[in-house]
Amino acid sequence: MKIYNTLTKAKEEFIPLQEGKVSMYVCGPTVYNYIHIGNARPVVVFDTVRRYLEYKGYDVNFVSNFTDVDDKIIKKANEEGVSAHEISERYIKEYLKDTEALNVLPVTTRPKATEEIDGMIDMIEELIEKGHAYEKNGTVYFKTRSFKQYGKLSKKNIDDLEAGARIAVADEKDDPMDFVLWKPKKVGEPAWSAPWCDGRPGWHIECSVMSKKYLGDQIDIHAGGEDLIFPHHENEIAQTECCTGKEFAKYWMHNGFLNVDNKKMSKSEGNFFTVREIFAEYAPAVLRFFLLSVNYRSPINFSRDIIESSKNGLERIQTAVEQLHFLAKVKAEKGELSTELTESESTLLKEFDALIKKFEDAMDDDFNTADAISSIFEMVKLSNTYVTVESSVEMIQKVLSNITTFCDILGLETEKKAEILDEEIEQLIADRQSARKAKDFAKSDEIRNLLLEKGIILEDTREGVKWKRA
């Protein structure tokens, strides 16, 4: 199996640090709003990477954090007149709902930055002691030039970067390229006590500390969107390697950007979509299918035509699986339970074996989900053409198992959501309202998630609860 390593700009044979085990860290969201479809891409991509590694027999320790203290969170809190904690907790819950709807598996550990402050202070103190950081008026800066390999991930030259940084350099910095590890508190901001001043950590130190605590000094895979290569991941490497003296991550993986109608997604362009807005029109499984339809390192373009194509593609697979379940049921009802394969069926299964290898070859080649999906479509075509009510039970079950197994590796749902009657929806909404009045918010969330699983989107408005089918 080969992985494209951003560090070396080449596909490399995947050899984990410890045989049979994989340590994996993916930078998580800054929780101040609902996630948009661009945010969803790394979540789905690296969930799929994790799924395939587990299929290959690896024990995966997958850590992904929540950045729950940040300028954007504080700004949102001030606008709403609530605490930063209230904002972050609200959107952590919404994030988990959205990712669950996208069929993303729970990660092994989900640390929050605000719960790891002591570890951040400890690492900053260690960097100061080792001569890699310094304090000025309460602010602690990382001494970038103390790390001789700075720029090795992004391939940026520190002298070229310095020329651009001089324009906005703070007077107290020793060097324009030095970055903040700890910043003093401001009025109305959350703060923690530290040896230098009451304040809060810089963004980059958070991930260095959390990955080190939960995965150790060295990890196999560090991943995220390509926008994180510089400065975030570059700075993580500098901090961590200056502390440990060891190579931080063996493989660096980065997904490409998502555009909308071939333009950068932005609110000013009017082409900005949260995943909730997509869920209002399409099942979450359709969005997941779309996000995996292109090689993860390539840019991906979202448009109405393309998402419709993804919907149709997923339905082709689901219809084939539905037909296979139907055939198996017919056989069972007739009592035809023979497991013997005919000669022609044995020959046909060899074609399926070739497609299984094709799927695995695609995924072994840097997780090429686009080609892997193509292999599933070829399985579906063979099934639709040759598997009939005359086929043996063994044949039907093997074909069904092949298709569902490989869809599951990609996290693609093979069963269509059962239709729910309007009356059932209204009753569940009424039950949810009763739970909310009784302040049973756990029950309220449970009902909302149940409806979401059935493709029903709720919207709480001043006029009451409105709902629509995805």
From Swiss-Prot:
EC number(s) given by UniProt: 6.1.1.16
Annotated residues for binding of ATP: 267
Cellular-component GO terms for this entry: cytosol
InterPro entries for this protein: Cys-tRNA-ligase (IPR015803), Cys-tRNA-synt_Ia_DALR (IPR015273), Cys-tRNA/MSH_ligase (IPR024909), CysS_C (IPR056411), Rossmann-like_a/b/a_fold (IPR014729), tRNA-synt_1_cat_dom (IPR032678), tRNAsynth_Ia_anticodon-bd (IPR009080)
Catalytic activity: tRNA(Cys) + L-cysteine + ATP = L-cysteinyl-tRNA(Cys) + AMP + diphosphate
HAMAP family given in the database record: Cys_tRNA_synth (MF_00041)
Name of the protein described by the UniProt record: Cysteine--tRNA ligase
Species the sequence originates in: Lachnoclostridium phytofermentans (strain ATCC 700394 / DSM 18823 / ISDg)
Upper taxonomic lineage: Bacteria, Bacillati, Bacillota, Clostridia, Lachnospirales
Gene encoding the protein: cysS
